[in-house]
Amino acid sequence: MEYEIYCDDCLTKMKEFKDNSIDLVLIDPPYNIGKDKWDKWRSVEDYVEFMGKVFKEIERVLKPNGSFYFFHNDFLQIVELQNWINTNSNFIFKSFLIWNKRYNGSPRKYYFDNV
């Protein structure tokens, strides 16, 4: 089995792929938390609209039994995104995976406090 990993803007990169050609999509999108200029939307609705374009492109490239995962850190926005997915796509939601980071968003000096 052959695997390829791409680190790129997902909307740009996925346009290169044929329909139903990808087994797994894993994205770490902007979180709309406003820390950087590329991570600011006027409203949650605008952010969900942007992410909807991403989800539709993922839906296009995924194989019928493919999977996709995305990271996020704002539960209220996750609910809005899940509502969009349930209403506007054929994806079947399976479960949340929670990665509980002890020092999420903290300076790196706190990452290895057990060393």
Predicted regions: what they are:
Residues 1-115:
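Core catalytic lobe of class I
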